[in-house]
């Protein structure tokens, strides 16, 4: 809806948050606590991507999506175009699906 309404920067931000909250859910049983997004990013890489529990591409996507969210939310110029937002939305769907599958099996 945001993308259709001409707000690719905000659409990209919401795609990031879908990945971020899925990452938090995947890390819920680690008993780790996080104060910053960077803590979730690092723990996702260390505890899920590095040991191969989830594909390492998801860690990269999470980091890239965070950077684009920062640009989209805090930049004065529109830095995230429609194509980039569509790609992030597709990645977010795949990311959330992979985490859902992981959670069902762990």
Task: List the predicted regions and their residue ranges.
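Terminal alpha-helical segments
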Residues: 1-106
């Amino acid at each position: 809806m945001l993308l259709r309404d001409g707000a690719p920067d905000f659409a990209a931000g919401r795609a990031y948050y879908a990945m971020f909250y899925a990452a938090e859910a995947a890390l819920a049983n680690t008993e780790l606590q996080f104060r910053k997004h960077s803590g979730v990013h690092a723990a996702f890489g260390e505890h899920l991507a590095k040991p191969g529990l989830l594909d390492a591409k998801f860690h990269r996507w999470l980091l890239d999506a965070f950077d684009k969210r920062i640009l989209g939310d805090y930049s004065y110029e529109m830095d995230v175009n429609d194509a980039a937002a569509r790609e992030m939305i597709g990645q977010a769907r795949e990311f959330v699906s992979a985490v859902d599958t992981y959670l069902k099996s762990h």
